Amino acid sequence: MIRTENLKPYFAPFLWENQAHHKYILKEYIQLLILDYLTTTDFVKKIVFIGGTNLRLVKGIDRFSEDLDFDCKNLSNSEFLAMTDGIVEFLKRMGFEVETRDKPNDKLKAYRRNIYFPELLFKSGLSGYKQERFLIKIENQDQQTAYTSQMATIKGCGLFFMFPVPADDVLCAMKVSALLSRQKGRDFYDVMFLLPQTGPDFNFLEQQCGINNAFDLKKALLEMISTVDLKHKSKDFEHLVFNPLSIKRVTLFKKFIEEWEMERTD
C-alpha cells in the first residue's frame, strides 16, 4: 500500500496545501488502481466508464469525484458481484484492508457495491478518528440507449492504460440528462464544463428525456432553473472542487445557458 506522501509528485502543489483534499487524492489513486485492474479482466468488455470520475480522469475537470460509475450492457447481477469480488481481492493483495457492506434496496435500478476501507484515513495520518468512513461506491447501470464506445487513455499516479468510454457528445448528453432529472450542484458544474467543448448527442437525449434539438434543450434547462436555488446547489459539492471559489460559476448557470451558442450542436 502506497504512502500518501508518495502521491505528491502526481498532483499540483496547490492541491496539497488544502489538507481536506488529501483523502480525495488517496481515493483517486485507489480509483485508478481499480480501473487498471479491470482492464486485465473480461468484465471490461461489458462496461463503459461514465460519470463524474470519467470527467476527472479522462477529461481533466477541476474537481474530485467520489464513485466509479459504469454503463453496462448484458452484465448480470452475478457477473457484477464476481467483478466486484475480484476488485476486493485485488485491493487486499495490494495491501488494503477492505470489506463490503451492502443492504438490499428494491428501489435501486442499478447494481451497486460499497467497498469500505476501515481505519484507512486514520492509519494514513489523514484523520484523528479511527472510525472515519472511507469508501468507494461502484455502480453499474444499463443506460438503455445504444451508442458506440471508444477507447480513452487514462493516466495518473504512475499508471497508464486504456479504458472504454462514451464519445464526448454522449457523455455530455448523460450529464445533461442527469442534471434535468436530479439537479445536483455537481451536475450544473459538469454541464458548464462540457457544453463549451461539445454539444450533446440528441439521439441519447431524445431516448432519455424526449429532447431532440438544441432549442428544446435550452428551453427545458431554463424552465428547470426557475425552480432551483443555484446558490444553495453550489454548496453541495464545495468539498470536491480544487478551488472553492470555482463553485460560484454555478450561480451563473442561467446566464450561461441563455448565452449558450446553440450552433455548436449542429
Where are these regions (language model features)?
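Structured mid-to-C-terminal alpha-helical surface segments
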Residues: 1-32, 39-47, 58, 75-266
